[in-house]
Amino acid sequence: MDVRANLRSIRISPRKVRLVTDLIRNKKVGDAIVILNNTNKKSSVPVQKLVKSAVANAVNNNGLDADRLFIKEIFVNEGPTLKRFRPRAHGRAYEILKRTSHITVTVSDGQQ
């Protein structure tokens, strides 16, 4: 059975979050949490919380065994972009894009 958890509008660029999510795809949940604990990236903390949330959803809502779960699918989509402006010389302004991410993780026990 597949169980899903979402994290929306996290204030980290999707490109940076994908570096972390690519490390744990198709791994067992226990192994993924160990990898995230030892990854020195800002996005590893929210991704780890999201994986733990998906496991809690699977155990509490669907009665699945946490030891049998693995990360079936994890992907990052682009969220809304905050636009800011930085003043420059001669009355100009440069646009700064503060990007956000939506992260979705699906855990499964391998059965239908």
From Swiss-Prot:
GO terms for biological process: translation. GO terms for molecular function: rRNA binding; structural constituent of ribosome. Keywords: Ribonucleoprotein, Ribosomal protein, RNA-binding, rRNA-binding. GO terms for cellular component: cytosolic large ribosomal subunit. Pfam families: Ribosomal_L22. InterPro entries: Ribosomal_uL22, Ribosomal_uL22_bac/chlpt-type, Ribosomal_uL22_bac/org-type, Ribosomal_uL22_CS, Ribosomal_uL22_sf. NCBIfam families: rplV_bact (TIGR01044). This protein binds specifically to 23S rRNA; its binding is stimulated by other ribosomal proteins, e.g. L4, L17, and L20. It is important during the early stages of 50S assembly. It makes multiple contacts with different domains of the 23S rRNA in the assembled 50S subunit and ribosome. The globular domain of the protein is located near the polypeptide exit tunnel on the outside of the subunit, while an extended beta-hairpin is found that lines the wall of the exit tunnel in the center of the 70S ribosome. HAMAP family: Ribosomal_uL22_B. Part of the 50S ribosomal subunit. Belongs to the universal ribosomal protein uL22 family. This is Large ribosomal subunit protein uL22. It comes from Spiroplasma kunkelii. The gene is rplV.
